Structure formats: structure tokens, C-alpha cells
Amino acid sequence: MSTFTRLIAATSSTFPRQCLTGGVLFATGDTIAQQLVEKRGSRHDLARTFRLSLYGGCVFSPLASIWFGRVLERVRFSSKAANIATKVALDQAIASPAFVALFFGATTIMEGGSPDQAKNKIIHNWWPTLKTAWGLWIPVQTLNMALVPPSQRLLFVNVVSIFWNTFLSIKSAAASDHAVKPNLNDAVELVETKLDKLH
């Protein structure tokens, strides 16, 4: 096990640590987006990274911890296949749509936007982002429910979320940062196209 994986595993066993891990991983995703995709270099938007870290630690992780640890674990069938199929279906029919909307709404408000601006951002970005989410998370969550012990499922999601958080950061910036919007749209379209081919 790599040092990075051991670090995440060590910080994913309790609720406060899960929140800390979520904050770190959202910050990591945004840093990758800004430095490797947007090529910002010294123009790195620290406030944006802080906002996403705050969202990951204080909004997403607490809700995800409850969802995986308390809600989905109540689903029990005698058949393992039925268990997996039901949990993945519930996760993608309920949690994914809600979390996508929550991300765009919460981050817009955290940027200083109005409720109307948050609503508009959700309307324009929710469905394209949700389709991309399904392309990634349906296979990921199937593996998660089938192979990963319940206590480590949020850890597994967090590791994959580094890449997903990078995409969300780019997608959010493309909808609000006009200075770099053309390049960001190219990156968003590339990811969406690749994941659409998995359907």
C-alpha cells in the first residue's frame, strides 16, 4: 500500500477524519484542475481552493458519510447480487442527482452568488454533469458495493473522487470564469465524451 493510500485510510475511519479527508481531497482536485488543466501557475486561486475544501469537508463528507454508513447499509437482501444492484440503483437515483445539484448550488453561494444565480447554475449544469457522473460512478459504485468492506467504502469513493473533484472544479469554473472559459470547456467536453462512450 502506498504512503498516500495509507494516509487516506488512516484518516477515513471516523466521522471527523472523514470530513478532514473530504476537505483535503476536494482541495487536491481543485489544485490539479488549476495547475495541470488551467495552467494557472502563480495565479492559483487560493480562495477557490479553500471554498472547495470547505465544501468537501463541511458539506459533502458529512452527508456522504451518513448516506453510505447509515442509509445504504440498511439495504439487505439474501442475494448479494440484489444487494449490489439495489444499492447502486439507490445511490445513482437519489444521491448522485442530489449531490450534483448541491455542489453547484452551494459553491455558487460560497462564491458570493445569489440564490437565483445558484438556481441558474444548477439548471444549466445539472443534467450534463449528472450524465457524466453516471458514466463514472455506476461502474465505480458497483465495484465498491461488490468488493469493498462497508467500513472502507467512503475511502474508496474518496480516492476516485480526486479525479471527479478535478472534473467538478473545471466544470464549475467553466460556468463562471470567463477568462479561461474556452480552454475549460474543451477539457469538460473531452471528459464528458470519454465517459459517454462507456454507456
Swiss-Prot record:
GO BP: any one term: ethanol metabolic process
Domain of life: Eukaryota
Family, per entry: Belongs to the peroxisomal membrane protein PXMP2/4 family.
Keyword entries, A-Z: Membrane, Mitochondrion, Mitochondrion inner membrane, Transmembrane, Transmembrane helix
UniProt KW Kinase keyword: no
Biological source species: Mycosarcoma maydis (Corn smut fungus)
Membrane-related topology note: Multi-pass membrane protein
GO cellular component, one term: mitochondrion
Protein name as it appears in the record: Protein SYM1
Residue ranges crossing the lipid bilayer per the database entry: 52-72, 93-113, 130-150, 154-174
Pfam family, one: Mpv17_PMP22
